[in-house]
Each structure stands twice: as structure tokens, then as C-alpha cells.
């Protein structure tokens, strides 16, 4: 049943958690327990998993278990969100997943060799594919949510209200440096104010000053920041110069525009994801969860992995370190960008 099962005694298909209605199997959970153990042990050689690491008495082993819960919670919440919004893998997604898998098969030389690498990680081909699929679902949710005109794109009122709550402003900004920055700022402000086509004048000024034309930038206000205070004080269509707000010699010339709601949608998506994570219901199979001794599990897993690698090397099967295998054969060890 695989190395994770042999090291833990927990069947891969066992239900370790239910997060927002999504089942998290022992295989999925133990994968991230292993990952957290590898991370900590790489930085703290000979770590004592029973050593306390916090004032409330949490040990390294308990910390690993909690971190693994937080990781699988992210994946489960994405699955639940996608299901709620009827977001499924597109044909393009499936083709990309298949191509990604084939790259690893080609790298290791055969289907059999690739599956051996997954076995070294301790996960099944199906389990690995399921993890990768969630990352595509996250991307699809994000793109649909943040693309104007798409089915999940929020209405303007929702985004406007959110922008107001967070203090978002959108502006064209020119940053000037050098000894003559203050004089230049005054001249540019006067010229820009006189121009009929403000956007075209911005592009022309960027070209003349050899500045990157970033276009409209959307920023959240920062209380007590001199430049931010000046930005938020502007009305839409109003312009101003800000002289050396940070005492470093830089000056800014700004034109406030209507808030770029598409830019706001991106941060609103992140906020919603965080809210869903915080609100997620987590039901733990206490019998399975409490039975896991992280120190014993990782020690046994390391031993089994070493033995398997030695056997694979004796038959000339390409191998790397356990960490290399987790990163390469399994496609990724990255979690969705939730934090």
C-alpha cells in the first residue's frame, strides 16, 4: 500500500479529515506531514520531535500535524469552491496535465521508472494527479473571478464597495529623482494639467524622461504614509505633486483616475479565499489523527525510503534524494498561494 502506509499503519484511503465537505485521505494528509518533516529536519538536524516549541507546550511533532492540516485545508477549500461555482478542468487543463506528466515519464525514461519515483515519495499516481488538478482549479477560479465579463467576475458595486473599504485608489504616477526633481515636478505638473489628453501626455512624459510607462497603478491607502495620504486626498481627475515625502530626494507627480476595478478584483479574490479558509469546517478523525506519532513515522519512512532507493540504484533506476523525488516526480510541493 506504499511507504506512507508502511511507516504509519494508516491506510491510504482512510478518511483523516473532512474539510468543508471535502474528504482528505490519509495519503493526502501524510504526504504533507512528510513534507513538513523534511523541511524541519533539513534545518534542524537530529530534531527531537517531542521537544516543545511554544509556550503552550506544542511539540515539533504536533506542529507538523497542525501544519499539514492547514495545507490540506487549502486544497480542500479550493475543491469545495470550484464545486460550488461549477468550475471544472477544461480540455486545455487536462491536456496540460497530461503533458506535464509525460515530461516526467520521459525524464525518468519509462512509465515504470516514473511510477517507482512516486512510490519513493509514497504516493499513488492518482493521488499525485489529484493534487496537481487542484492547482489548475485554483488558476481557473482566479482567472474567471478576475476577468471582466466572465461568469464569476463580481459586479461593479461589490468591487467599488470593497475598494472603498480598503481605501484603494488608482493613479498615473511619475517618480522623479535627482537634484532638479522638485523643479521638474512643478514644470511637469503644469504641463500635464494643461494637456487635453492626459493619458497620451503621460506616455509622452515617460518617453521623454526615460521612465517605464507602468500605466494606471492601484494601491491601498497606508495610514500615516505621506505619499499615500496625498494620493487619497485627490479627487478623480485631480492632479498634484508631492515633494520628497520620504526625505530621500524623490518627488512624485500624480493624476488620480477612476478606480481600476479589475485590479481590485485580484485582491478581492485573495480576501475571499482567506475568508473561506477561516470559515472552513474541519472534522478530524480523532482515532487516526491521534494515532500518528510523527517522530516514529518519519524515522520509519526515512529508513524505508533509503532501502527502496538502494534497491532502485542496484537495478540502475534513476534516483535522486528523497527531497529531489518529492519535488520532481510528484510535480510540485508548492501549495496554492493562499497566504
Give the residues covered by each predicted segment.
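Acidic helix-start/capping segments at beta-turn-to-alpha-helix junctions
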Residues: 50-59, 79, 89-110, 210
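Acidic/polar surface patches and capping/hinge elements
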Residues: 129, 136-172, 179
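Peptidyl-prolyl cis-trans isomerase
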Residues: 187-227
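C-terminal soluble interaction/assembly domains
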Residues: 242-271, 275
Amino acid at each position: 500500500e506504499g511507504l506512507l502506509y508502511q511507516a504509519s499503519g494508516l491506510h491510504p484511503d482512510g478518511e483523516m479529515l473532512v474539510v468543508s465537505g471535502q474528504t482528505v485521505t490519509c495519503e493526502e494528509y501524510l504526504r504533507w506531514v512528510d513534507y513538513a518533516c523534511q523541511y524541519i529536519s533539513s534545518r534542524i538536524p537530529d530534531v527531537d520531535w517531542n521537544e516543545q516549541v511554544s509556550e503552550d507546550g506544542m511539540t515539533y511533532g504536533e506542529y507538523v500535524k497542525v501544519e499539514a492540516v492547514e495545507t490540506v485545508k487549502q486544497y480542500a477549500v479550493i475543491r469545495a469552491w470550484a464545486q460550488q461555482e461549477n468550475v471544472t478542468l477544461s480540455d486545455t487543463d487536462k491536456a496540460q496535465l497530461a503533458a506535464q506528466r509525460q515530461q516526467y515519464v520521459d525524464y525518468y525514461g519509462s512509465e515504470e521508472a516514473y511510477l517507482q519515483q512516486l512510490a519513493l515519495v509514497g504516493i499513488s499516481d492518482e493521488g499525485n494527479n489529484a493534487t496537481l488538478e487542484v492547482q489548475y482549479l485554483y488558476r481557473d477560479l482566479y482567472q474567471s473571478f478576475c476577468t471582466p465579463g466572465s461568469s464569476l467576475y463580481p459586479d461593479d458595486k461589490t468591487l467599488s464597495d470593497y475598494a472603498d473599504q480598503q481605501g484603494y485608489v488608482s493613479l498615473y504616477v511619475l517618480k522623479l529623482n535627482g537634484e532638479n526633481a522638485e523643479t521638474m515636478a512643478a514644470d511637469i505638473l503644469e504641463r500635464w494639467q494643461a494637456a487635453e489628453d492626459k493619458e497620451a501626455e503621460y506616455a509622452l512624459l515617460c518617453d521623454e524622461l526615460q521612465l517605464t510607462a507602468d500605466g494606471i497603478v492601484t494601491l491601498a491607502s497606508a495610514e500615516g504614509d505621506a505619499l499615500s495620504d496625498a494620493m487619497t486626498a485627490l479627487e478623480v481627475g485631480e492632479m498634484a505633486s508631492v515633494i520628497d515625502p520620504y526625505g530621500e530626494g524623490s518627488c512624485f507627480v500624480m493624476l488620480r483616475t477612476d478606480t481600476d476595478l479589475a485590479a481590485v478584483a485580484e485582491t478581492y479574490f485573495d480576501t475571499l479565499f482567506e475568508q473561506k479558509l477561516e470559515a472552513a469546517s474541519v472534522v478530524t478523525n480523532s482515532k487516526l489523527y491521534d494515532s500518528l506519532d510523527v517522530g516514529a513515522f518519519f524515522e520509519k519512512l526515512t529508513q524505508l525510503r533509503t532501502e527502496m532507493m538502494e534497491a532502485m540504484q542496484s537495478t540502475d533506476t534513476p534516483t535522486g534524494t528523497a527531497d529531489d523525488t518529492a519535488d520532481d516526480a510528484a510535480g510540485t510541493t508548492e501549495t496554492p498561494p493562499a497566504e
